[in-house]
A protein has these predicted regions:
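Short secondary-structure transition hinges
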Residues: 104-136, 156, 183-185
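Generic hydrophobic, amphipathic alpha-helix propensity
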Residues: 10-22, 38, 63-71, 137
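Hydrophobic/aromatic-rich alpha-helical bundle segments in the mid-to-C-terminal region
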Residues: 123, 145-196, 206
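Hydrophobic alpha-helical connector segments
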Residues: 62, 76-104, 155-163, 189-192
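N-terminal intrinsically disordered/low-complexity leader segments
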Residues: 1-12, 152, 178-181
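Helical hydrophobic small-molecule/effector-binding pocket
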Residues: 69-73, 88-113, 135-138, 163-174, ...
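Helix-turn-helix
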Residues: 5, 16, 24-58, 62
Length: 206
C-alpha cells in the first residue's frame, strides 16, 4: 500500500515494520530473519504485515529503493571534486559521508547482497548502489588527470576497483561478523582515514 494513502496510524505501523526489518537484517541477515521476527520486533501481529507488503522480498526492495533514491543518489549532487593534490578534506569528507550513510543502513546492504546472487531484481539494485561510488571515483580520477596526476589510470577501471574495495571493507567492518575474526580492531575514524588514504594515494601517489 503506498505510504501516501495511509492514515497516520497506518504510517506509524508501516514505519515500525520497516525499522524492525532494518535492525534484524543487520543482525541476522535476510535469510535468518522471518516475517514473524519482524512483526514481533515491531510489536505488530503477522497479519498486519500484508496490509503494507506482499512478502519479505517486497519489504526489502522497498527499503533498498528508498535508501537509494532518497538518500544515496541525492548525496552525490553535493560532492565537490578536489581542488588540488593536497586537498585531504575532499577525501575525508566524502568517505565520512559514505561510511556513516552505509553504516546506518548496513542491514539493507547485507540483505541485498544475499539476494543479488540469485535474483536479478536485487542484482540490479546492488549495481545501482555500486554505480554511485564508481561515478564519484571516476570523476575524481579525471580531475586528478586534469591536474597532471594519475595519467596512466583508467577512470572506470580504477573506479570499479576502489568502489568494490570500499563495499567489501565496509561490509566486513560494519557487519555483524566484524573485524574481530581477522584479529583486528578498528574505529570509525581509523576506517575512514584508511579508505581516504588508499583513494588519495591511488590518484596522486602522496
Amino acid at each position: 500500500m503506498p505510504a501516501a494513502t495511509l492514515t497516520a496510524k497506518g504510517r506509524q505501523t508501516r514505519a515500525a515494520i520497516e525499522q524492525a526489518a532494518r535492525k534484524l537484517f543487520a543482525e541476522r541477515g535476510f535469510h535468518g530473519t522471518t516475517l514473524a521476527d519482524i512483526t514481533s520486533a515491531a510489536g505488530k501481529s503477522p497479519a498486519v504485515f500484508y496490509r503494507y507488503f506482499a512478502d519479505k522480498e517486497d519489504l526489502l526492495a522497498f527499503l533498498a529503493e528508498s535508501f537509494l533514491h532518497d538518500v544515496v543518489t541525492p548525496s552525490a549532487l553535493r560532492v565537490q571534486l578536489p581542488d588540488a593534490p593536497d586537498d585531504d578534506a575532499f577525501f575525508t569528507s566524502v568517505v565520512t559521508g559514505y561510511w556513516n550513510m552505509f553504516k546506518q543502513n548496513i542491514g539493507i546492504m547485507i540483505a541485498v547482497a544475499q539476494l543479488a546472487a540469485t535474483q536479478r531484481r536485487f542484482a540490479h539494485l546492488q549495481n545501482e548502489f555500486r554505480r554511485f561510488g564508481m561515478d564519484i571515483v571516476a570523476a575524481s580520477v579525471r580531475r586528478a588527470q586534469e591536474q597532471g596526476h594519475g595519467t596512466d589510470l583508467h577512470p572506470q577501471h580504477t573506479a570499479a576497483a576502489i568502489a568494490l574495495l570500499f563495499e567489501n571493507f565496509t561490509t566486513v567492518f560494519v557487519g555483524t561478523s566484524g573485524p574481530e575474526g581477522l584479529g583486528l580492531k578498528i574505529s570509525d575514524t581509523d576506517a575512514i582515514a584508511t579508505l581516504s588514504t588508499v583513494w588519495k594515494k591511488t590518484l596522486y601517489g602522496t
